[in-house]
């Protein structure tokens, strides 16, 4: 077996033979009912990256299709970048574009991530949290957009467990207890539904369904719902043979239990963006408990669980028609291709795609009755571009329900929208302040790119001022602007604004520059330096380095620790690492006016509110420092833990930064991390 032999002698971090991983990934792909080529590619997905096998060899052995899938997966894993942010953005872009060429590449990546999350326990806690956070931000929305709900739910629960293990265990125990207490009532309601449908001549399968742990946690955290109010909702699925029976069941449910007004949703007539279809109703059941029922056909149920992968099931059964999920995903993929062709860089691509990725939809109508699906918050201009690019480009006004309506006002589900056009009209720069769909943004930008330089500069200024909020360009000095221009190798502010307006620079990234975040890390670590800035006695010193565990800075009490290679590592006097055996000597600073820059690490607890991080960045910039790295973690009581690595000249400079940070509203605690004993 090629995969087994190729990975011979390789082991996972858990100590298991590496081959167990591709076998598990292939098993997940098989459970998704994909074709044999996808299963083969899953078994081989790490062969090109981790072994001497080449794409050409795989092509000869298994065919071009399998080799291309494996190569596509491998290329996603091989990308190397200067920063983690850059890596995440570019990897995401590559994955999305790979998906537009062959959806199986990303399905294998989803399966790969699923097994990695299942076996996360052997990694360090900080690495588990980082991988779990990335999974929640990228892979869970992706699985949802493709309609693969059981994968999305599992990834969410595994990520929740990795990021908040204690909360996970507490909530799991609560759910287990609640489930046992609910069992009798669940069986009673289920039996009442079955009897009612049998008496009505409707053949159906009925079972109770429960929310997974992460969804319960999110409802408690974000919507501030109490645990018992979430668990008191009794939810059931009813599966029938055809669409007519779905509506018959709905009628019987409303005869059995009292329906709650305005709580019926028809996703059969208007499916969700990922192809999901069902009838949903909320009623008042026995003893006054809330009862939710989701009604599906067998095909709808399969699409609800399998999403786009249900397409392969139907093909194997001899049906060639695409499912609703498949058709909608194909349209979505085509829209992603259009976005990629219109944007200037990876950051802009991701900013545009995010709005398309996990949307809450509204449904509006054209005057002829065609349904147009848009994300929540979409405006008439978004609607115009959804109908056709030419309609958007020549839009001058709109009527909603035959009445004038502002172009910038958000639409609501059920409205009939009529766009007024003028062949001499053109898109306005101001539209970019309120449109929400990627299609509208990219089409407007595409048109504006063809306009004169002056308009591009105006567009760039609008976008940058929006990104800088609550600041604007006028708040920054000529010297601050010059610093940003020099970092970007640009000669003037107009040139910078034009680059933003043309989409060649990201407004959000430039905004970070203005509040102290550089595109290129400055040379502030200075791991090696000339020993003339300090004295270390009585040692003979070769190379001298600053310890990265405690980050000593000019003015600190310091100790030299000599390594076997005659290199002296300078530590803070109170660093815990000094308890390890090494030849030590007191050291002192010689040159107080040293031009060497130092790196200090601060640990900050701040209220988790809008613009909290921006306030910190502004304080650092105002202190004539720059940010080298940042990590964040959510704490209890709506607090955010922020760890900053900043560039400083000496302890006085650091004290000034700390003083400014302590003056920020919402800051609870600030301390320096010196790895203290």
Swiss-Prot record:
SMART domains in alphabetical order: HDc, RelA_SpoT
Report the residue ranges that make up the TGS domain in this protein: 360-421
What GO annotations for molecular function exist for this entry? Answer: GTP diphosphokinase activity; guanosine-3',5'-bis(diphosphate) 3'-diphosphatase activity
Task: Tell me which cofactor or cofactors this protein depends on.
Answer: Mn(2+)
* Record carries keyword Acetylation: no
Reactions catalysed, as given in the entry: guanosine 3',5'-bis(diphosphate) + H2O = GDP + diphosphate + H(+)
Tell me which EC number(s) this protein carries: 3.1.7.2
Q: What is this protein called?
A: Guanosine-3',5'-bis(diphosphate) 3'-pyrophosphohydrolase
Q: Which gene encodes it?
A: spoT
